[in-house]
Amino acid sequence: MSWQNNLRSVSPYIAGEQAELTDMIKLNTNENPYPPSLQVQKVIEDFKSDNLRLYPSTDAKVLRKALATYHHLNTDQVFIGNGSDEVLSLSFLTFFNSEKPLLMPDISYSFYPIYCGLYHIPYQKIPLADDFSLSVNSYFQENGGIVIANPNAPTGMAISLQEIEEILQNNQDSIVLIDEAYIDFGGESCLPLLEKFDNLVVVQTFFKSRSLAGIRLGVAFGSAEAIAHLYDMKNSFNSYPIDSLAQKIGEASLNDETYFQKSVSKIITTRENFKKELIKLGFQVTDSKTNFVFVHHPKVDATTLFKALYEAKIIVRHWNQARISDWLRITIGTDREMNTVIQFLKEYLKNKEKSY
Amino acid sequence: MSWQNNLRSVSPYIAGEQAELTDMIKLNTNENPYPPSLQVQKVIEDFKSDNLRLYPSTDAKVLRKALATYHHLNTDQVFIGNGSDEVLSLSFLTFFNSEKPLLMPDISYSFYPIYCGLYHIPYQKIPLADDFSLSVNSYFQENGGIVIANPNAPTGMAISLQEIEEILQNNQDSIVLIDEAYIDFGGESCLPLLEKFDNLVVVQTFFKSRSLAGIRLGVAFGSAEAIAHLYDMKNSFNSYPIDSLAQKIGEASLNDETYFQKSVSKIITTRENFKKELIKLGFQVTDSKTNFVFVHHPKVDATTLFKALYEAKIIVRHWNQARISDWLRITIGTDREMNTVIQFLKEYLKNKEKSY
């Protein structure tokens, strides 16, 4: 016997590398290339540190209300957590306490099975089609819950509002969790379905489209009943998850709609141009509605290309995982960064041709 | 069947009321009456919001190293979490996965049994003596872990380094978690025992003695092995729990030792003076080594006094709980605030005498 016998064994998630090379082009963790709204800078400059001696609002009250107004929901339909990973984690713990399996696509955010391992939630991976498309019919079976990222990661592909509605209609006895971390880049949010379904929970984040990865703000929207259960869970885990400054920063970002729309549409334009160039170079590219693309070249081994890019100080993401080991995920940076990537790929492919 | 059947039921913690009265004297949640170090103000003013588009360091690398240096430990002996509540929560989940009961004092931080409920950890409350003192012998029995707040909350009473060593020596097959949230106000930290015991985990916080309740920084210290397990757990729950600004603020606070010592010693002086005055008024007062006092008046019902104080806009804390329902916990504020409390109590007791 030893204290080690009482440890709970887990298989932790491995986050994308935070490489620290100088002059690198960092396209591996889907960070936004543009700074947050100037309102954020202002709110930080104006912040009086005296306030920090006091506890923050336990439910980020002002921000919660602002988010409700923004999305035309009631305040009690909004939950705020310490980044969307925490929101997902607490949601899994709250809603998926069943002996029936949680259903999820076989290719999706790799944190989902880790939460399942942590909380002993049985789960079943539902294979996507060969083209990574999702068939809603495969979710019409007994389950203890459903989690789908829409748009999906790392494929970037989205499903329609109607498809989500079909899943909800056929699963009214389970929570259907739709992870909309990337929704602002072109997908269609299913928030309007909250009017019809009390078993829908939608998770979003401030980090990608609002350039606030550094501040950790994640959100869940749902029926007042579901959200109340999520708060009960949060209050069993940590009373004050969101610090005072983060709350203010979230409010400031939410108030600057013009900047938000502008920076999101810049990224979408860059993505579409980047996609066209990739296709010209012979890449296969999924129809991404996110701030990244998922790409494959029939003539190039993905691991080899990943390494070549890395040596050129262009950091992208690759998974040594069945079905996607031939693919790379590339975050959309600035036009300039993406042009550098295209120039590199042109050279790389040209040299490769020569060596045949 | 409905989705409600799959909910995990919990009994959430209820935090001290964040009353929003004007001109109130808020002495109910142990917040520090003094602002944080001026270095904190400076680091906020100098912070460039552009940095927020990037993820924070997953383990608050720089702050982690600074804390290790500060406490003469190795970096791998330091864990940083989103407030000490999160650190405690993850520690319970990591270390107390046994069928034998976790031992804790019957009167202690009321979040402990809530974590146990959440994670299905069996626990056994060990009664403190009538004077709220802790007998180490009662912890020499089979267990799946031990958690003791030192100084204890809400009694404020501390145990000695030697007593903790005895507990460790007799429980080498369990993690002994010492919660030192209030240690800076006069208790003796057991960090030096880390040299001898790999089953000791010590939790501290930035919020009380460093006036940073608003920023959410909690810390665990332990053997490199124990801390590695805690990080595995954290990485199964949330990759990036500490935002970039909080990391910088923590560093700034840690660097200003002079201010830290000064504000802590001011609070200790105020506490000792306040205690003397209370004793003069006939109160029974525990030997608190914290930034609060725990008091009882033989002639006054605690609930009645709590309400009278509340009406005078002096907010303190009371628990309707066996053994302590006759007691009030009063946070140490400024000298001026504590004088106001004493003046109120003098009047109150005088009027009470009259009404006999």
From Swiss-Prot, chains A, B:
Q: Does the keyword Transferase apply?
A: yes
Q: What class of enzyme is it?
A: transferase
What positions are modified (N6-(pyridoxal phosphate)lysine)? 208
Q: Which residues form a coiled coil?
A: none
Q: Which SUPFAM superfamilies match?
A: PLP-dependent transferases (SSF53383)
State the needed cofactors, names only: pyridoxal 5'-phosphate
Q: Which UniProt keywords apply?
A: Amino-acid biosynthesis, Aminotransferase, Histidine biosynthesis, Pyridoxal phosphate, Transferase
Q: Which reaction does it catalyse?
A: L-histidinol phosphate + 2-oxoglutarate = 3-(imidazol-4-yl)-2-oxopropyl phosphate + L-glutamate
Gene Ontology process terms (BP): L-histidine biosynthetic process
Under Enzyme Commission nomenclature, its number is 2.6.1.9
MF annotations from Gene Ontology: histidinol-phosphate transaminase activity; pyridoxal phosphate binding
User: Is Zinc-finger set as a keyword in this record?
Assistant: no
Q: Which domain of life is it from?
A: Bacteria
Copy the pathway line from the protein's UniProt record: Amino-acid biosynthesis; L-histidine biosynthesis; L-histidine from 5-phospho-alpha-D-ribose 1-diphosphate: step 7/9
The family annotation for this protein states: Belongs to the class-II pyridoxal-phosphate-dependent aminotransferase family. Histidinol-phosphate aminotransferase subfamily.
Q: Provide the assembly information.
A: Homodimer.
Q: What is this protein called?
A: Histidinol-phosphate aminotransferase
Recorded source organism is: Lactococcus lactis subsp. cremoris (strain MG1363)
